[in-house]
């Protein structure tokens, strides 16, 4: 999952937001070729209703085009914020409870997960945070519960294959316990 645009990014300057929208228009069209060439399913997570109609249509076309691919799975977070995702999901679940579709005593962690944008997608194993930042920035807060973190001072535009390999090597050295104790 790539965090392309947060719900908070709308607060940036008009020029920067307009530039990002122009980039999205171009990139979403390129994603169809990327999807086809790699047999990759691409899903956009976040609230796309805030985008211009042409961007929403490009998102729908991309997701429809790639829906049957299953070799690779790629998510792009656009107008995404984890708190917003959880709020939207809980509103849907509350409506289903009110409509009698879900009983409150049936609600589990899996039930909650099924109402999130990432429903049906495994939680990340590794989060790579670039540019020296050491915070989640409202990103996948529910899904990152047992994710391993890798922090690097390298800025995103300069993050290349060698840095990715290093992150994966560090990840492979870790003992993932999912809340358990280290076995001796």
Protein language model features and the residues they cover:
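Flexible, compositionally biased loop and terminal segments
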Residues: 1-184
């Amino acid at each position: 999952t790539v965090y392309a645009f947060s719900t908070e990014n709308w607060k940036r300057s008009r020029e920067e937001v307009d530039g990002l929208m122009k980039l999205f228009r171009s990139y979403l069209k390129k994603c169809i070729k990327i999807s086809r060439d790699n047999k990759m399913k691409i899903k956009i997570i976040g609230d796309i209703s805030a985008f211009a109609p042409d961007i929403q249509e490009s998102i729908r076309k991309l997701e429809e085009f790639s829906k049957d691919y299953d070799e690779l799975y790629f998510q792009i977070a656009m107008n995404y914020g984890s708190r917003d995702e959880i709020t939207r999901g809980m509103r849907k679940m509350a409506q289903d409870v009110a409509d009698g579709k879900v009983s409150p005593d049936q609600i589990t962690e899996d039930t909650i997960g099924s109402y999130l944008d990432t429903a049906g997608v495994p939680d990340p194993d590794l989060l790579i945070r670039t540019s020296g930042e050491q915070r989640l920035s409202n990103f996948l807060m529910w899904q990152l519960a047992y994710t391993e973190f890798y922090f690097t001072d390298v800025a995103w535009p300069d993050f290349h294959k060698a840095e990715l390999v290093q992150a994966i090597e560090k990840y492979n050295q870790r003992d993932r316990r999912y809340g358990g104790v280290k076995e001796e």
